[in-house]
Amino acid sequence: MKDLLKFLKQQGKTEEFEGIKIGLASPDLIRSWSFGEVKKPETINYRTFKPEREGLFCARIFGPVKDYECLCGKYKRLKHRGVICEKCGVEVTQTKVRRERMGHIELASPVAHIWFLKSLPSRIGLMLDMTLRDIERVLYFESYVVIEPGMTSLERGQMLTEENYLDALEEYGDEFEAKMGAEAVLDLLRAIDLEKEIEQMREELPSINSETRRKKVTKRLKLIEAFYTSGNKPEWMILKVLPVLPPDLRPLVPLDGGRFATSDLNDLYRRVINRNNRLKRLLDLAAPDIIVRNEKRMLQESVDALLDNGRRGRAITGSNKRPLKSLADMIKGKQGRFRQNLLGKRVDYSGRSVITVGPTLRLHQCGLPKKMALELFKPFIYGKLEGRGLATTIKAAKKMVEREVAEVWDVLDEVIREHPVMLNRAPTLHRLGIQAFEPVLIEGKAIQLHPLVCAAYNADFDGDQMAVHVPLTLEAQLEARALMMSTNNILSPANGEPIIVPSQDVVLGLYYISRERVNGRGEAMAFESVAEAEKAYRVGAAELHARVKVRITETIIGENGERTKQRRIVDTTVGRAILSQILPAGLSFDLVNQDMGKKQISKLLNTCYRQLGLKDTVIFADQLMYTGFQYATISGASVGINDMVIPEEKYSLVADAEAEVIEIQEQFQSGLVTAGERYNKVIDIWASANEKVSKAMMENLSSETVINRHGEEEKQKSFNSIYMMADSGARGSAAQIRQLAGMRGLMAKPDGSIIETPIVANFREGLNVLQYFISTHGARKGLADTALKTANSGYLTRRLVDVAQDLVIIEDDCGATEGLSMKPLIEGGDVVEPLRERVLGRVVAEDVMYPGTDEVLAPRNTLLDEAWCDKLEQHSVDEVQVRSVITCETDFGVCAKCYGRDLARGHIINMGEAIGVVAAQSIGEPGTQLTMRTFHIGGAASRASAENSVQVKNAGTLKLHNAKYVTNSDGKLVIVSRSSELAIIDELGREKERYKVPYGTVLDTKEGAEVNAGQIIANWDPHTHPIITEVAGSIKFVDMIDGVTITRQTDELTGLSSIVVLDVGQRTSAGKEMRPAVRLVDDNGNDLTIPGTDVPAQYFLPGNAIVNLDDNAKISVGDALARIPQESSKTRDITGGLPRVADLFEARRPKEPAILAEISGTISFGKETKGKRRLVITPNDGGDAYEEMIPKWRNLNVFEGEKVERGEVIADGPESAHDILRLRGIHNVANYIVNEVQDVYRLQGVKINDKHIEVIIRQMLRKCIITQAGDSEFLEGEQVEVARVKIANRDLEAAGKQPAKFERELLGITKASLATESFISAASFQETTRVLTEAAVGGKSDNLRGLKENVIVGRLIPAGTGFAYHKNRAKARASGEETAAPTITASEAEQNLADLLNLAGSQE
């Protein structure tokens, strides 16, 4: 009996499999799956509702309609199991076989499979080397194709029209064979000898010169090799037999009223069967060719529609005009099999309800309505009731629960105790969107949620709903408690800062309790303990904000964790003393002895977590919340109209601005300024007026003057409610207060341009109709934007998750020695991100030395925690090599050392952590906060971009980075290199600021000189680009002929004349070939050379250059020979926000990218063509020169004869990530993408750790292009996973063979997701048909390595707790121990089962 149960359990388990292979099915294979041929299009008999014989629902083919009962009713009950009824031919078995038994249709004429024909690139076309158009013409009977040319002049695969065919017949008779339709294509495919083709193409490849032809041949070779290695035969792409889906997967359901609801597939199959039968009959009758042809074409079309409706021609529609859903539609898209049923399922033991606040809960609790709990925990309750003997059977227990007997509630309490439940709020944007809590039973119907977890869920209580899920098994409960409990998720995985931070009311209450007030009641009292201070407050002797002296007791935790108490007297307020009571032992009182805003509270919690650990922090957070709520109530802060104080200065400031605007308007009308300038100036005037008003308002609001107890006036922070809310960070911001009490300011039109008349009123004064109308513009656009943003952000997250889903920590240390070098991020002079924030939680890649010595400060493989970062700061280290995911050497995963600290836990990351998904969520989750718009640069912004000097902010020492310079006659330095940077170093050697300085900058100080804050140290002209001479001498004009290559112009204002070089297009034919230049000679007229080389000092002048010198003039080093006017670069729109992030991760090439030098060498210009310049770079080592054609309108940064390094910018523009990777390497491209993405997020004040972006970049760099195949089996130009090549190369090197050489390639995230090795993952992402077609042709197998594939096949994922499970299975496999089934034969089991059932039957 036990054996039987074991056997039945065993039946549920499928055999273990290690992968899934996809391939083409041969006609014989399809027949072997089938249980019979479907010959008739009938479905079921409409009177008896029984399936028709040999029809689409035939019981004989597919199995019985009722369990263990044949169709005619001769055999019923289990004992006849396996009998085939002789009357109706139905096997007596379970009805569920109708879900798995397939049928088939023998097609009267072969039919091409539309996926292999039409999904691009067409596989059949590639195989036959014919165009898709031609093949379609053959298939749809429009022309003939030659199959066997025989002894004629025709060629195999040649297309013949009807006339050509008849002509050929007359000429050659039956020497040759030509056909049309799928038979023709079938014959052509059959005739291909794969081995021979491969040999031929391999021989042919090296000799091909044309790039396109080579690409085509490689593609074809890869396809044919795929067929050859996978054992697929090309003719299987043409169907001779069509499989029929099991009927229960395309059900026909009777509705009431005699109608039927049916799956579209039945209609499509019926069409195919009808046409197939008609074709058979026509062939039997030997009908005229044209009729048969038409029928064959129709059969082809109906099969196309069944497989992929709408891919060719118009989609076949049903009775209600909508296209029928074909087999391809069943699996693709959001509603398809993959995304609807395999990746996301509905689960039982779940419920949902509205949420409300639970301010009395502890952090690990949630309030669960009794009704819900009763329903969710039913099986547990039944079990308990039965176990206690309160109910004899499950049925009785059920009745008790339905009647809600008193005992049931006691049992429920017991069941629920310590049984965590999971709460989830949609949309689940990151892993904190599902957390576990211990339920507390409550009355009512709403779930109660702890206020501190709202931030993680992004929940509010305006009607949000949440879902509850019950973990059933012990393991599930354990995981929920250990990993998902809200108390274990205090830090955000995105940036490692606390996410359980009080907000709103709580912040306001804590801020209120910690404020001080001048001359408050009880000021200057002294208390011997905190308790005494509190007593004084409770009896009313002192108020909360009074400044007093209190003796406090602090616990100090020493180095070794020993605790010592110490007492001291502090100046504080009563409120802060009371607040210090909840401070956990071990934290200093100074942390609360300040105004507690949101930032301070967050820091306090962070410090608490780092110093005292999880438990204390959780308790403390709860206490903070209770205290905050209590004192927020006591504070009575509320918003009244009198709190919005309008500054008196407002009206005069507005009047001044209006006067200025009128003045500009007058200038415009008299033609002194252009329309554009006028608009920009007006907007600037109003923007600055708005700033001034809001400044005056904030000064007015934020402080008040009071009389202190010595009778003197003293300023103190104001207790204005609105100001307190904003200052504490509880709600609102200066910008919002400005609209309430300042002026509303400038508004934008929906297209993003600014309306030049601002709204001068504020909300307290009220808006008039026009002002209100202008406001609605922006407000409505905001709403529309939000809707778009949500969708876009969600799609970005989906792509990120898809590309990174298979990255898991799989080993401890890969031993990689290289890493990324981290420096503080400095932008335009400010330190945006100090070094400690960038390296915190990373592992050191190379020993960090004490600056200036060779003594090791932090050895390799140190995990830099807070203490180490403090050390680095003390010793002013300004660059650290840290290990990074990008340089990790692990194949198919990442090692813990390269990843560093797990941000959500604060220690080094665990094995099996799914870092890819965490990274994707961290980047995607704040997506909705990013803006959607592209910024038009106008007004203030565009002038800021035309900087012309560097003003230092900090005192320090001047240092130049990769700069070449010459000293001019005034003794100043002139920069003559391109990408130079200037940095200010403080006395500790730390870099404080850094600026880019262009070519031609004049420096007022020498390198290494001391500079003071506010000093201007560098100047340049932003509107022209000078040509600086590096030698002194006299100038000689070359090819500068007036009227041919140059013209003279006289400046109207100054009367000075200057020479302007004509552009090539403007010159006469005589001047086209001339190259105007300035040559430098000494006093004797001999050519001078550029110092250190034998290159003559000759400077070629580009078109439009202006020369202010005359022939033979004397000049000195560092003077400008000529100036090239720079058109103020067209105000480009900078793509901001979400679209910019998407562009970076998709690695899109910008429209007009910067042009970078492909090789290092010397620049020269070759012969020009119409509209283009020829740029030639001659390498210094005398290799082949590199040529590139550059459009004339691009501003070049280089002159003839200048030396450039590989990857240097030649023409400005946005840099393309692909170019950076190719020319400057992986480290640079990684830095570029990380910094660009971070810029967008930083602008919105969102913190994301660099690690997460690096994880995505690793996935973007996962493929490479083979440049030299060596002895490997890769093809040149093939795209392969880097890990694959590395593994292959290791084997080759071990065998002493030539390894393959490769070049890394950067793929956008969509491309990278579709290019994964796992076809299941790729198919469930996008372009399902294309992915599956490609996989089938190549006979790919999926090893189920990633997370997504395992979810789809219904296994534990190989990450987290499933990581060990997969590891153990791999071990068991390696040692060959497969799980053995118990020794019981099927017949024994049947016998046992029959006995059992008969026993049960006799008892009834």
From Swiss-Prot:
Cofactors demanded by this protein: Mg(2+); Zn(2+)
A GO BP annotation: DNA-templated transcription
Record note on cofactor: Binds 1 Mg(2+) ion per subunit.
Keyword Zinc attributed: yes
GO MF annotation, one: DNA binding
An example Gene Ontology CC term for this record: DNA-directed RNA polymerase complex
Pfam families in UniProt: RNA_pol_Rpb1_1, RNA_pol_Rpb1_2, RNA_pol_Rpb1_3, RNA_pol_Rpb1_4, RNA_pol_Rpb1_5
Record EC number: 2.7.7.6
Keywords: DNA-directed RNA polymerase, Magnesium, Metal-binding, Nucleotidyltransferase, Transcription, Transferase, Zinc
SUPFAM superfamilies noted in UniProt: beta and beta-prime subunits of DNA dependent RNA-polymerase
Entry binding sites for Zn(2+) 2: 814, 888, 895, 898
Reactions the enzyme catalyzes: RNA(n) + a ribonucleoside 5'-triphosphate = RNA(n+1) + diphosphate
Superkingdom, natural source: Bacteria
Residues involved in Zn(2+) 1 binding: 70, 72, 85, 88
Cytoplasm recorded as keyword: no
Residues noted as binding Mg(2+) in the record, renumbered to the chain: 460, 462, 464
Family: Belongs to the RNA polymerase beta' chain family.
PANTHER family in the cross-refs: DNA-DIRECTED RNA POLYMERASE, DNA-DIRECTED RNA POLYMERASE SUBUNIT BETA
Role played: DNA-dependent RNA polymerase catalyzes the transcription of DNA into RNA using the four ribonucleoside triphosphates as substrates.
NCBIfam families: rpoC_TIGR (TIGR02386)
Self-association and partners: The RNAP catalytic core consists of 2 alpha, 1 beta, 1 beta' and 1 omega subunit. When a sigma factor is associated with the core the holoenzyme is formed, which can initiate transcription.
Name of the protein described by the UniProt record: DNA-directed RNA polymerase subunit beta'
Upper lineage: Bacteria, Pseudomonadati, Pseudomonadota, Gammaproteobacteria, Alteromonadales
